[in-house]
Amino acid sequence: MPYHYLFLALFTYLATSNVVSGSTQACLPVGPRKNGMNVNFYKYSLLDSTTYSYPQYMTSGYASNWN
């Protein structure tokens, strides 16, 4: 059973370090756009379904091309 705790500690450490290293300047909405990035950031409230209840969005084809 000690290996289970060692694995859990290692997993937690790696998961936390990945979150910290994943935040780069190019991905922040306040940073300038870089070549090759065409991203717009929008603010939404938690559990906001306004976009999905908007018929023009759902029929435009954008919603079906997310993957």
UniProtKB/Swiss-Prot annotation:
Gene3D superfamilies: 2.60.120.1560. GO terms for cellular component: endoplasmic reticulum. Could be the product of a pseudogene. The ORF corresponds to a fragmentary flocculin piece with sequence similarity to FLO1. Belongs to the flocculin family. This is Uncharacterized protein YHR212W-A.
